[in-house]
UniProtKB/Swiss-Prot annotation:
It comes from the Bacteria. GO terms for cellular component: bacterial nucleoid; cytosol. One of its GO terms (molecular function) is DNA binding. This is Nucleoid-associated protein RPD_0086. Keywords: Cytoplasm, DNA-binding. It comes from Rhodopseudomonas palustris (strain BisB5). NCBIfam families: DNA_YbaB_EbfC (TIGR00103). Belongs to the YbaB/EbfC family. The keyword Ribosomal protein does not apply.
């Protein structure tokens, strides 16, 4: 019975730490870029896009296809960085628990 109570206490502590981590992830902002910085996407570590910056040279009618490609690439770059930041926070939180990877706790 004591083991069960200990596990319940650990679960409650983990839940509290998860809430705090979610707040931290919301404060972390990463930036992805493409085209040598012509397009930049800012994103939180919770994968929420916070802003997009586009160099004026790309805002020409004949640059539409290039701009689309650069936006996709910049978003992908920001997403990778946000995912890495989230994984780092998750590792710090769950590192000693021996949980299997890929549980989607973030």
């Amino acid at each position: 019975m004591a083991d069960f109570l200990g596990m319940m206490k650990q679960a409650a502590q983990l839940q509290s730490k998860m809430k705090a981590m979610q707040a931290e992830l919301d404060q972390i902002e990463v930036e992805g870029s493409s085209g040598g910085g012509l397009v930049q996407v800012r994103m939180s570590a919770k994968m929420e896009v916070r802003g997009v910056s586009i160099d004026p040279s790309l805002l020409k009618p004949d640059e539409g296809g290039v701009l689309e490609d650069l936006l996709v690439a910049a978003h992908a770059d920001a997403h990778r960085k946000a995912e890495a930041a989230m994984q780092e926070k998750m590792q710090a939180l769950t590192g000693g628990l021996g949980l299997p990877p890929g549980l989607g706790l973030g």
